[in-house]
């Protein structure tokens, strides 16, 4: 009986090793580096509030300028950025950003020091000709919001009109909105 089990185990493991070696194996770092090459910038929104947040998550959220609920930032895609987003995925939601969404955020919710609306003088002071040029450079990941000096590095959003359609306590794959969310741009448009 024992010999039969050993033979079965040898055949099973040799088959699996052959299957694994012959199939395409991709590591997690390969996938992340390929994503960074495809994605230029992320739109990140903090969904959960400040209560019961552990210190490690609070410091990561502070580094990303997401200190309050319903704040949004545009982050250039880097390896450390993806790691930070995955670390605090139970408090935020993120998606790749396009130029149209970046322009809408800058038009409606962009603020400068003193919490005043952005003017053309502020954009020219930042080194851009138009708001479209600024939105394009942000969505392509060429510049970070923290580098544009008269502008605030975050956007203060309101709760979405007509409420959340999915749960705010679960990840996107579990019928929630947290973590990587494919429908975040539509949600952000309802929050502007």
Feature roles, as predicted:
Residues 13-192:
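Core subunits and conserved enzymes of cellular information-processing
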């Amino acid at each position: 009986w024992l010999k039969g089990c050993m033979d079965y185990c040898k055949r099973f493991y040799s088959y699996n090793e052959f299957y694994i070696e012959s199939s395409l194996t991709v590591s997690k770092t390969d996938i992340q580096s390929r994503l960074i090459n495809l994605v230029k910038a992320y739109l990140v929104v903090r969904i959960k509030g400040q209560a019961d947040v552990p210190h490690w998550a609070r410091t990561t959220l502070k580094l990303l300028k997401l200190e309050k609920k319903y704040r949004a930032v545009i982050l250039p895609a880097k390896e450390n950025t993806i790691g930070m987003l995955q670390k605090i995925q139970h408090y935020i939601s993120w998606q790749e950003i396009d130029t149209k969404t970046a322009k809408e955020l800058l038009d409606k919710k962009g603020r400068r020091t003193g919490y005043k609306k952005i003017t053309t003088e502020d954009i020219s002071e930042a080194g851009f000709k138009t708001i479209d040029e600024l939105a394009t450079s942000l969505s392509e990941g060429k510049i970070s919001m923290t580098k544009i000096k008269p502008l605030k590095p975050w956007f203060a959003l309101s709760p979405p009109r007509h409420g959340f359609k999915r749960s705010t306590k679960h990840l996107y794959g579990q019928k929630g909105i947290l973590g990587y969310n494919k429908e975040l741009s539509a949600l952000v448009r309802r929050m502007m």
